[in-house]
Amino acid sequence: IHDGIRPLIDADVLTDVIDVCNRYGNAVTSLPYNEQIFVISQEDASTTKQYVPREQLRRVSTPQAYRYGKLLDAYRKAFRENIGIHGSSYTNTMMVDLGETLHFAKGSDKNIKLTTKGDLELFKAYITADEDTWLK
């Protein structure tokens, strides 16, 4: 599964997603999370007293892979039982809500999601740069 809003996917990532899915039945592109996450206080949304250690976090994106039969059965169950599909069609969260263990595959920081003007500027910089510099 891949979305067209991430056009800079490379062969190494695709190969690892396929390999991990062949071994375990699914694969989710991921990277370590390098920012700090703080939990908003219930008393005051402009404050915090709690953080989530970044070592416990992974950033996930597309591509992702699932064995077709398992994915089809999961969607049928999710719609039938209204599980994991509340306002979202994101496959990974649905699968976790259904109790599935997800397996991480290699990701890439260059696999950016084009949603803002800044993303487009970064995309333009990547595609106008020398391919040997960044397409590795």
Residues of each region from the PLM?
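Glycine-rich beta-alpha junction loops
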Residues: P32-E35, D109-K110, G118
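Short linear loop/turn motifs
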Residues: Y90-T91, D109-K113
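Short beta-strand-to-loop acidic/aromatic patch adjacent to the donor-nucleotide binding site
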Residues: I1-I5
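Glycine-rich phosphate/pyrophosphate-binding loop and the adjoining helix
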Residues: T101, S108, A125
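Conserved core of the sugar-phosphate nucleotidyltransferase
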Residues: L8-A105, K136
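Short, small-residue-enriched loops and turns at beta-alpha junctions
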Residues: R6-L8, I112-K113
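Hydrophobic helical membrane-anchoring modules
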Residues: N111-K136
